[in-house]
């Protein structure tokens, strides 16, 4: 998969997106909006993503009852954080400004993901 291309396309789809990362097979691919400082170090981001992947695995336990999970979103004091599965075990992580229309951004990310992945 062309992770760098996916990150670039997601980052450019909305000006309120701060950061995009794809974590897949133990590798982290990331892109940050120019002029923005990341709140987390790369190591902290990797730990956070590995924890998010675990949470996604627990969500899949209820698939037979409520269907496949599509995305997860959390609001923090400084950012929104959106996670979306990609590939077999990968995860897209996007952070946005609090002023962002996160539902609109999430729909755009899902469309971009569908161009590069079957899920």
Residue ranges and their predicted role:
Residues 1-119:
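Non-catalytic interaction/Regulatory regions outside core domains
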């Amino acid at each position: 998969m062309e992770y760098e291309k996916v990150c670039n396309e997601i980052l450019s789809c909305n000006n309120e997106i701060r950061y995009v990362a794809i974590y897949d097979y133990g590798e982290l691919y990331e892109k940050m909006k120019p002029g923005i400082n990341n709140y987390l170090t790369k190591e902290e981001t990797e730990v956070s993503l590995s924890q998010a992947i675990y949470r996604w695995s627990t969500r899949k336990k209820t698939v037979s009852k409520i269907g496949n999970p599509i995305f997860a979103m959390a609001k923090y004091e400084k950012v929104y954080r959106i996670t979306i599965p990609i590939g077999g075990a990968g995860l897209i992580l996007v952070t946005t400004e609090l002023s962002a229309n996160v539902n609109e951004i999430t729909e755009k990310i899902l469309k971009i993901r569908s161009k590069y992945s079957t899920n």
